[in-house]
Amino acid sequence: MTKTYTKAKEMAELVGTQGWMDDALSSKDELKAENGRPGPFGLVAGLNEEHDSIEEEEEEEDDGEKPKRRGPKKKKMTKARLERFRARRVKANARERTRMHGLNDALDNLRRVMPCYSKTQKLSKIETLRLARNYIWALSEVLETGQTPEGKSFVEMLCKGLSQPTSNLVAGCLQLGPQTLFLEKHEEKTPGCESAISSHSFTYQSPGLPSPPYGSMETHLLHLKPPAFKSLVDASFGNPPDCTTPPYEGPLTPPLSISGNFSLKQDGSPDLDKPYAFMAHYPSVSLAGAHGHPTHFQNAVPRYEIPIDMSYESYPHHVAGPQLNAIFNE
């Protein structure tokens, strides 16, 4: 009886252990099945991955639709390319240099055919072109109207639109004298003196003075003042204005006196021996010509007699001679 009891007890334990093993195996299978089935979070992750892939595909399509970048593509700078660039630059510089040399030579040839060519005063490019235009215009007017190219209108055409130094150069080279141009400008500025200046034409030449290319405008204005003053005085006093000033012959030498055994004295003019009243009332031609003033200008100046305080008695020469000899003999 005891054996059976023990066998039955062992059998029950064996059955219990087998059931426990079956339960364990079934639990493992359930875990595998649960891992194989996607949960709710797994579905959300899968949807996000699909959305990201779709967006990447759309971006790739958009990149393909954009226009390509224009312009030269940047290439790597090599020694060969640098040499080509340098050679191209040298050729361009040589071409520009040749062009400028040709332009300068053409302008020099144009300056030589102009009426006021000067080696010392070189006209600028713009002044050369303006003078050439005025020269062509003036020559065409001369051919059409038949006027001489030595009048004032010809000079006005040449100097139109030019600077003052260029106008002086033109007037000096044409030997027309800048005083006529100055008078015309002065008439425009001062219309009150128009009648006095325009009614008298004067020619005043100053020998030994520089020509307009080498002199300044102030020197020409300075030389214009004496004839203008003379013409105005002539007009006011009613004297004929056809008198010209003689050329300057140098300053008069003063009388020399050397204290010693001999003395040198310049021969005086016979007019100097005459009294002052006689000279003032009746000036001689020699004195007026020696000082460079015409006689009519001396007559036009008002006369003033200088009073002498001391008493002056005039003795005849035949009486003064014996008296002086008697004084020296004593």
Swiss-Prot record:
Protein encoded by which gene: NEUROD4
Tissues expressing this chain: Expressed in both the developing central nervous system and peripheral nervous system.
Organism (species): Gallus gallus
Locations listed in the record: Nucleus
Biological function: Probably acts as a transcriptional activator. Mediates neuronal differentiation. Required for the regulation of amacrine cell fate specification in the retina.
Subunit structure: Efficient DNA binding requires dimerization with another bHLH protein.
Ranges of biased composition (kind: Basic residues): 67-79
InterPro entries membership: bHLH_dom, bHLH_transcription_factors, HLH_DNA-bd_sf, NeuroD_DUF, TF_bHLH_NeuroD
Chief subcellular location: nucleus
Protein name: Neurogenic differentiation factor 4
Acidic residues bias (residue ranges): 52-64
Lineage: Eukaryota, Metazoa, Chordata, Craniata, Vertebrata
Region spans: Disordered: 1-79
